[in-house]
Swiss-Prot record:
Modified residues (Pyrrolidone carboxylic acid): 1
Pfam families: V-set (PF07686)
Organism: Oryctolagus cuniculus (Rabbit)
Any GO BP: adaptive immune response
Span of domain Ig-like: 1-107
Name the UniProt record assigns to this protein: Ig heavy chain V-A2 region BS-1
Other noteworthy facts: This chain was obtained from antibody to type III pneumococci and was isolated from the serum of a single rabbit.
One GO CC term, this protein: immunoglobulin complex
Keyword annotations: Adaptive immunity, Immunity, Immunoglobulin, Pyrrolidone carboxylic acid
Length: 114
């Protein structure tokens, strides 16, 4: 069971970021998947989640600018970037609760906004 993020890269403010989280070994109809990020020198910050039902929930700051969608085996994040969005972005599987135990993590992908 694994998840893996697509490649990040170098972006400019106002660019649209599109990241894909590819899952294997489990079904998105049975698990919630979260997108989280970690800016340099900072802690983890959640962006949003996609529940097994297909419902999405977002952090307050992300509601107006982020969209999470899914296909059969991917969870996709689209985000309108600002200069403060440089971070390593991760997807993770949640096993319990709204933002409960995240037991399967991707390696992360670095997004630089400059």
């Amino acid at each position: 069971q694994s998840v893996k993020e697509s490649e990040g890269g170098l972006f400019k403010p106002t660019d649209t970021l599109t990241l894909t989280c590819t899952v294997s070994g489990f079904s998105l109809s049975s698990y919630t998947v979260a997108w989280v990020r970690q800016a340099p020198g900072z802690g983890l910050e959640w962006i949003g989640i996609l529940k097994s039902s297909g419902s999405t929930y977002y952090a307050s700051w992300a509601k107006s600018r982020s969209t999470i969608t899914r296909t059969q085996n991917t969870v996709n994040l689209m985000b309108s970037l600002t200069a403060z969005d440089t971070a390593t972005y991760f997807c993770a599987r949640i096993t319990h609760g709204y933002l409960g135990l995240m037991d399967v993590w991707g390696p992360g992908t670095l997004v630089t906004v400059s």
